[in-house]
A protein has these predicted regions:
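Nucleic-acid endonuclease domains
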Residues: 2-111, 121-173
Length: 173
């Protein structure tokens, strides 16, 4: 079950309040200390996980197959992919700022906690990053349209990951 906008804002307010509060005292003997308050990075990770979970069910295989590039017109299919993710964010009642045309980070400051999401669509096993190098501050929803040929068939699906997944093993970045 998704949290309401009010519940989400309350969670953020409580987390920020905890970050600014006095240090937590040690637990009495025999009791475990309380867990530390969630960091902003952890809040982003948890919110992205919630978005990704809904995206995997809302963006069906039929919707993904419909995104397949036709006649080399990649921009047409990308224009269709952004509204799919927008619907997911709206269903969760999240606030965000949409990027303008040809700008990086399609959805900025999602949930008011600085979560930036880039939507990528691919018909194969390559994701093109154009002008923006992936990094730890950008989260990616990758819409894979599936691949069928005589040797291998890979079904369509939604992938979700942090930008570090793309650059950790790169000797170029």
């Amino acid at each position: 079950m998704a949290m309401t906008k009010e519940q989400h804002e309350q969670l953020i307010a409580e987390a920020l309040e905890l970050e600014n509060s006095v240090p937590i005292l040690p637990a009495p003997p025999g009791r475990a200390p309380p867990p530390p308050p969630p960091t902003l990075e952890m809040q982003r990770h948890l919110l992205f996980a919630e978005i990704f979970t809904l995206a995997k069910t809302f963006i069906t295989k039929e919707k993904l197959v419909a995104l397949t590039t036709k006649n080399g017109d990649t921009q047409a299919s990308e224009r269709t992919s952004i509204p799919l993710v927008k619907s997911v964010l709206d269903q969760l009642g999240l606030t965000y700022t949409e990027a303008g045309s040809q700008q990086s980070k399609d959805f900025r400051n999602v949930g008011g906690i600085g979560l930036d999401i880039e939507v990528k669509k691919t018909d194969g096993n390559t994701v093109t990053f154009n002008d923006t190098c992936p990094n730890k501050d950008i989260w990616y929803l990758i819409l894979f349209t599936g691949k069928e040929n005589t040797r291998t068939s890979i079904p369509p699906g939604v992938l979700g990951m942090n930008g570090t997944e793309f650059i950790d093993d790169s000797e170029w970045v």
